[in-house]
């Protein structure tokens, strides 16, 4: 992600992974209500999720959830979300530069677009497989409603892991890996590569210095591009993960059912919520990530100088 100047020390792989994990967790805590609103909007209109309550827009969904199910509902599934970022974002973001450098080893020129995309594909794919159980639990906790006397499927995050593994199967914790892999390959490549290219263009053309305003603008552009490309796969992933056993035989059948029953616009349900969430998440995560890397390396230099 644009190498630091010669006067700066390159962050180590450990610093990048730690910084990515901490920054992603902070971003998740702040933006989680938007993510919950996105999930509710995405499953709206689905058979098992239908109810007398209709969600209208992002703020309307958040307000309705707070009024009908209580403010804590906006953070239902947060522990799984934090676990997801620790196991997922720390790897896909923290390893991106190192994998990119590996693909570019032996070359004096900067990493090509192909190398950047390859790095995004590899880190995103590995992270999805490791973090998929946390994604399944997070989505199900966000989707379940406590209204109309409906008994919730899960009483908490760890109860959800246990119930899913014992009543469905252990493999169900990896349910939806295919659409989630597709989604996160798109997200990882688009998000990291767009951020990398945008930041590089701003810094190399001396439009902005490699500082907070540059990181903020690059993150916003990356967030919009990512949401636009990933939204259809994201909706299918959410529907499939949240589905009851046997409701959809496969991922394609889930997508086809959405198309025939709700039309093509169903694939962009919750788009505004997705952008608000991903855009703000990107800004918080990337700005914190860049600053934390710098501060950790400064601290390390200070320690090295005193020893």
From Swiss-Prot:
Induction: Up-regulated in response to cold in brown adipose tissue where it may regulate non-shivering thermogenesis (at protein level). Up-regulated by high-fat diet (at protein level). The modification Cysteine sulfenic acid (-SOH) is found at residue 254. Sulfenylation at Cys-254 is increased upon cold exposure. It increases the sensitivity of UCP1 thermogenic function to the activation by noradrenaline probably through structural effects. May undergo ubiquitin-mediated proteasomal degradation. Disruption phenotype: Mice lacking Ucp1 display an absence of adaptive thermogenesis in response to cold. Compared to wild-type mice, they are sensitive to cold and consume less oxygen upon treatment with beta-3-adrenergic-receptor agonists that normally activate thermogenesis. They also display impaired adaptive thermogenesis in response to diet variation. If they display lipid accumulation in adipocytes of brown adipose tissues, no overt obesity is observed when mice are housed under classical conditions, i.e. 18 to 20 degrees Celsius. However, when mice are housed at thermoneutrality, i.e. Fatty acid 16:0 binds at residues 56, 269. Residues 33-73, 134-178, 233-266 are mitochondrial matrix. Solcar repeats lie at residues 11-102, 111-201, 210-295. PROSITE patterns: SOLCAR (PS50920). The keyword Transferase does not apply. SUPFAM superfamilies: Mitochondrial carrier. It comes from the Eukaryota. Residues 1-10, 97-116, 196-212, 290-307 are mitochondrial intermembrane. Expressed in brown adipose tissue. GO terms for cellular component: mitochondrial envelope; mitochondrial inner membrane; mitochondrion. One of its GO terms (molecular function) is long-chain fatty acid binding. GO terms for biological process: adaptive thermogenesis; brown fat cell differentiation; cellular response to cold; cellular response to dehydroepiandrosterone; cellular response to fatty acid; cellular response to hormone stimulus; cellular response to reactive oxygen species; diet induced thermogenesis. Gene3D superfamilies: Mitochondrial carrier domain. Changing residue 189 to A: No effect on UCP1 activity in thermogenic respiration. Changing residue 25 to A: No effect on UCP1 activity in thermogenic respiration. Has no constitutive proton transporter activity and has to be activated by long-chain fatty acids/LCFAs. Inhibited by purine nucleotides. Both purine nucleotides and LCFAs bind the cytosolic side of the transporter and directly compete to activate or inhibit it. Activated by noradrenaline and reactive oxygen species. Despite lacking canonical translational encoding for selenocysteine, a small pool of the protein has been observed to selectively incorporate selenocysteine at 'Cys-254'. Mitochondrial transporter that functions as a long-chain fatty acid/LCFA and proton symporter, simultaneously transporting one LCFA and one proton through the inner mitochondrial membrane. However, LCFAs remaining associated with the transporter via their hydrophobic tails, it results in an apparent transport of protons activated by LCFAs. Thereby, dissipates the mitochondrial proton gradient and converts the energy of substrate oxydation into heat instead of ATP. Belongs to the mitochondrial carrier (TC 2.A.29) family. This is Mitochondrial brown fat uncoupling protein 1. It comes from Mus musculus (Mouse). The gene is Ucp1.
């Amino acid at each position: 992600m644009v190498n630091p100047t010669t006067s700066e020390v390159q962050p180590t792989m450990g610093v990048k992974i730690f910084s990515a994990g901490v920054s992603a967790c902070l971003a998740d805590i702040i933006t989680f209500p938007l993510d919950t609103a996105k999930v509710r909007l995405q499953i709206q209109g689905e058979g098992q999720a239908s109810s007398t309550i209709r969600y209208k827009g992002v703020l309307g969904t958040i307000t309705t959830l707070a009024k009908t199910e209580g403010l804590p509902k906006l953070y239902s599934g947060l522990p799984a979300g934090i676990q997801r970022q620790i196991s997922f974002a720390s790897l896909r973001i923290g390893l991106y530069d190192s994998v990119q450098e590996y693909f570019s080893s032996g070359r004096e020129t900067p990493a090509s677009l192909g190398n950047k995309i390859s790095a995004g594909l590899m880190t995103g794919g590995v992270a999805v497989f490791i973090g998929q159980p946390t994604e399944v639990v997070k989505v199900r906790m966000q989707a379940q409603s406590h209204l109309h006397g409906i008994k919730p499927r899960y009483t908490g995050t760890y109860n959800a892991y246990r119930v899913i593994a014992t009543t469905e199967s252990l493999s169900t914790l990896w349910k939806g890996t295919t659409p989630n892999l597709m989604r996160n390959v798109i997200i990882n490549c688009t998000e990291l590569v767009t951020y990398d290219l945008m930041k590089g263009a701003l810094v190399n053309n001396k439009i902005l210095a490699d500082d907070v305003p540059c990181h903020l603008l690059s993150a916003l552009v990356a967030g919009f591009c990512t949401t636009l490309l990933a939204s259809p796969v994201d909706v299918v992933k959410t529907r499939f993960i949240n589905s009851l056993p046997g409701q959809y035989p496969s991922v394609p059948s889930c997508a086809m059912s959405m198309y025939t029953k709700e039309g093509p616009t169903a694939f962009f349900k919750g788009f505004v919520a997705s952008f608000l969430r991903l855009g703000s998440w990107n800004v918080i995560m990337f700005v914190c990530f860049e600053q934390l890397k710098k501060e950790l390396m400064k601290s390390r230099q200070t320690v090295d100088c005193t020893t």
